[in-house]
Regions:
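Amphipathic interaction/junction segments at domain boundaries or subunit interfaces
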Residues: 42-149
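N-terminal leader/assembly segments
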Residues: 1-66
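Short, mixed-charge aromatic SLiMs
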Residues: 30-37, 78-81, 173-185
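Short terminal or interdomain "cap/linker" segment that borders an active site or interface and mediates
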Residues: 3-6, 10, 110-147, 151, ...
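Short alpha-helical "patches" and their helix-cap loops
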Residues: 20-32, 71-72, 92, 103, ...
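Intrinsically disordered or highly flexible coil/loop and linker segments, enriched in small
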Residues: 18-22, 33-34, 99, 111-118, ...
Length: 187
């Protein structure tokens, strides 16, 4: 995982209430926090470290709030240099729409992950589509946590475009495959 993404996740943790923040940091461990924070943002951290941080957050806040934390994380990541230029270029080409960004989701995936599967997006209507992740190494990590994280990232994409909408898991397999149904509307 790109260090910038794990750093954005840790920044989102810092915005949580003090009690939750302290529990999460204690579970993660100071050495892991420092390793992530000290890394160059463009470098890659082991996926095991990133998932350890993610799992500790989920263990404290639960599944629903984990999606919210990831929404905040991705909004922070969109504002960092690594993704800001990508988003600017994509919105210049496709316009600032969820569909335009979702069509480029595999490129974002390639920018921030390694060996974490691939994403495909299919538009199913003017303001809806499906996004499918295949090939995530679910046998190595807690897949439910990653599924929630991606859902939060998709929600952040909708919010970035100044739209409202929903992201629902419609299919999830133990083999590292998940499909999301996404709907959005302007304003």
């Amino acid at each position: 995982m790109r260090a910038a993404q794990t750093q954005s996740l840790l920044a989102a943790v810092e915005r949580l209430p003090a009690g939750e923040r302290a529990k999460i940091r204690a579970l993660i461990g100071e050495a892991a926090v420092e390793r992530a924070r000290e890394a160059l943002p463009v470098s890659f951290l082991p996926m095991s470290l990133h998932m350890h941080v993610s799992d500790c957050i989920r263990d404290v806040v639960g599944p629903a709030r984990n999606v919210e934390v990831w929404r905040e994380t991705m909004l922070l990541a969109f504002d960092r240099p690594l993704l800001r230029s990508f988003v600017d270029m994509t919105t210049r080409i496709f316009g600032i729409s969820p569909a335009g960004l979702f069509k480029r989701s595999q490129k974002v995936n390639e920018l921030i992950t390694r060996n974490a599967g691939s994403l495909t997006f299919a538009l199913t209507g003017p303001h809806e589509g499906t996004l499918t992740l295949v090939g995530f190494p679910a046998h190595q990590f807690r897949f439910a946590c990653y599924v929630e994280g991606v859902a939060g990232c998709l929600e952040a994409t909708i919010a970035l475009c100044r739209c409202t909408g929903t992201v629902k898991v419609v299919e999830q397999g133990a083999d590292g495959r998940v499909t999301y149904a996404i709907e959005w509307r302007e304003g």
